[in-house]
Amino acid sequence: MPSYDFEQFYESCFSRSFEIVHDGVNEKSILKLHGDERKEAERLLLQSLGTDKDSYSRPVIALGLLRSKEAVEPLKQRLETATGIDRIQTALALFRIEKYPEAEKIIIDCLKITNTNSADEMAQWLAVEVLPHFGKTNQVVESLLDAMIQDNMAGRSATNSLRTLFIDDEPIRNLLGQILLNPHDAHKPDFVSRPELVNQAIELIRKHLEK
C-alpha cells in the first residue's frame, strides 16, 4: 500500500482537479519520498513528459525537486521549444538537478520585453519569484530592480524577492518593506509615493553592490 506522501505526490502531480492544479505540486511530500517509492515516482514522472499527463509543468517541477539525473536530457530537449512559464520551470528544474549554467540567463530573458516578445505577466511574475534561487548575483539583482519599477504583480513580487536577498541588510530590508506596504500608507501626512521609494531603493542597492 502506498504511503501518504506517495499518494499526495501522485495527486498533486497528476490530478486534473482545479483545486489541486491551483495549489501546485506538494513539495513537502515529494521531498519525503525515498527508496522504492522515490524510484517509482521518478519513473512515473519521466513517463508522463510530453503526454496528456504533462500539465502545468507539474512533472517538470517534481523531477527538479527529486534531483532526477535521468531527467536531464529530456528536460534539455524540452527547453529547446518551451516558452513562458514552462520554459522557466524547465530551466529551474535543470538548475536544481545539475546547476545548469544557462538557467539564470534563460529565466532573466523571460523578463525582457522586445518587439517580438510581448509582456506575459504570469511568466514575469514566476521569473522574479524563482530568481532568488540563483543567489545575489549582479544579473539577478539588476533584473529584479528593473522589474520592481513596474507597479503590477511582477513588480510587487520583484520587491519581495529583493527583500529576501537583502534580508540581512536592515536599511535595504526596511525600505523594500515600505514599498510593499506603500498603498496602505497613503493617508499618512508624510506619505512618499511608490516611484520615489523605488528610486531610493534602487540607489541604495546599487551602492551596496559597489562595495
Q: Residue ranges of each PLM-predicted region?
A:
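Amphipathic alpha-helical scaffolding segments comprising HEAT/armadillo-like alpha-solenoid repeats
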Residues: 1-11, 35-49, 68-80, 100-114, ...
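Short, mixed-charge aromatic SLiMs
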Residues: 86-87, 150-155, 186-189
